[in-house]
Structures are given as C-alpha cells and as structure tokens.
C-alpha cells in the first residue's frame, strides 16, 4: 500500500550550497530536504544551473519536426515489432486511443563495447536517434543534457544522504556514470479538438495517467506551466503547484526500499488537461550490479525490515509491474 503523505506543501529549496564546500550550508539544505521528503514527498530544486529554456526549445523543435515514419522507425517494440528495444525509442500516440507521445533515451555511455551491452543484459540498450541531418542539434543536446542531469541528480542525492544522517557521498558508488541505468523521457501532451477516451479515478477525476509510484532512485522533473500533478495525502488528492524554472524532485521506490519508507515514494497521478504541454522527467537509477544495503535513517524508530536488492533486478521487475498496472505509456 502506498504511504499517504502527511502534507501537500511543496517547498522550493535553494540547492546551490550542495555544489560548494560550506558544510553548515549543506546541512541547512539537507534539513529542508528532510522536511520535504517527510512531508508531501516533493520539493522544487532552484538554482540548479540548467538552462530550461534551451531544453524546451530543443524538445519542442524535435516534436514539431518528427514525421510519422520517423516515429514508427524509432518506436519501441510495443509499437514496432521490428525494434527489439523496450526502453529507448519512441512511444507513439495511437489515434482514437492514446494522445500522449514521447521519446526515451538512456545512458550515452552504452555503446556496443560496454560490458552490459555485449552480454545482452536486460534494461541496457544502445540509443537509437533520429536522422542527424534532419535533427542536427537533437542528439548532441540530449547527450549533454543526460550528463548534466546525472551530475545534478548525484548532487541532490548527496543532499538526501545528509538528510538521512549518512556521509555526503554515501550513494556515489551506486551512481557511477558509466553504468547508470538512468533515463530521460521527453513527453508531449497535445491539445486536441477531439481527445481519445481517458481514465477516471475513483473520485471522478479525469486522468492522463493513473496513480503510481516512480520506479527510480529519485525523479527530477521539468514541466511546462500547466498544472496537472496531484499527490495522495491523508486528506485525499491534492494539487502540486507548477514552477516556471525549477525541477520537481521526489523519491522513487528504491529510495523507499533502502530507507524502509522513511523517505517514501509519494503516490501521485496526472490529471487530464487538454492543453499543449511538456513533461520531461529524468529518472535517476543506479547501475545494474549496484546494491545499497537497507539502513535505519537517523531519527527513524523502526528497524531494518527490507532485504538488499540489486538495482538491475529492482528496475526490471519494477518497470514491468508499472506497465501491468498502468498500461504501456
């Protein structure tokens, strides 16, 4: 059962001290992160150093230029049986059934010579990209953005480590860049005169995506300013505000697992809004063989009750379960 969050408050936290060397300032940020993760489970990270206007420009340009044939050629196996990829690729809209479309890509370090690729390890794929003559700046931007977001997310994890009473670099080994299973999804929700049928929540709320817990270590999301997200609290579903320039951060189920739900994965859902908008999550994941032993965070009253779980097994089973529960995105 999901944890019902005690609050709907989503604070904005200046994370710039986490990039510096002032231990006292880092501790103050960690205290704010602690309050957010124990409150609504969400916070906005500001002063993050990412050019979000360029991000929107590149993604809008990409979605506007993609042809139907390009979308099919890049589509994952669920939409194109000729493509064996199940993670990297295009997630197509289906006329009359599904309006949302997206492109997901993985670690740029996953080349044919990467040991996990060579071994055919699940969840590892060499990225497919659209034609570089038609989309000249897309791949270079995306690869740079992936590395920038991995660095930002690793810095955030250092703040979470301090918030949990652990050494600052407690999570670093599990997040090594060359093996990271992290992913970026470039999701477009269109405005349509005639929208396909959408789901309805138990409370009557129309939904673009039903309630779920993120399969990640943490999720770091930028989205355009159309309010759509809700978090489940002890008082029911409550709206999460938007932000023009900041990243929305929440814990995924691996963080919940290793902290015994001290930092839970908040249950959340996407309201149906017929408006053109972008949702651009970075899902921070560890390497396939990474294992973080569950521990008792500083200040927690319970003992460790979860077993150690390799990140590869966690991710493979978690993503499969999410598709079974909520359908193919």
Swiss-Prot record:
Q: Which GO terms describe its molecular function?
A: iron ion binding; isopenicillin-N synthase activity; L-ascorbic acid binding
Query: What reaction is this protein's catalytic activity?
Result: N-[(5S)-5-amino-5-carboxypentanoyl]-L-cysteinyl-D-valine + O2 = isopenicillin N + 2 H2O
- Residue ranges of domain Fe2OG dioxygenase in the record: 180-286
Binding site residues for N-[(5S)-5-amino-5-carboxypentanoyl]-L-cysteinyl-D-valine: 87, 91, 183, 189, 212, 214, 279
Q: Which GO terms are recorded in the biological process aspect for this UniProt protein?
A: antibiotic biosynthetic process
| SUPFAM superfamilies from the UniProt entry | Clavaminate synthase-like
**InterPro entries in alphabetical order:** DIOX_N, IPNS-like_FE2OG_OXY, IPNS-like_sf, Iron_ascorbate_oxido_reductase, Isopenicillin-N_synth_CS, Oxoglu/Fe-dep_dioxygenase_dom
Top enzyme class? oxidoreductase
Q: Which family does it belong to?
A: Belongs to the iron/ascorbate-dependent oxidoreductase family.
What does the function comment of this entry state? Removes, in the presence of oxygen, 4 hydrogen atoms from delta-L-(alpha-aminoadipyl)-L-cysteinyl-D-valine (ACV) to form the azetidinone and thiazolidine rings of isopenicillin.
Name of this chain's protein: Isopenicillin N synthase
Task: Record the organism.
Answer: Streptomyces clavuligerus
Write the gene name: pcbC
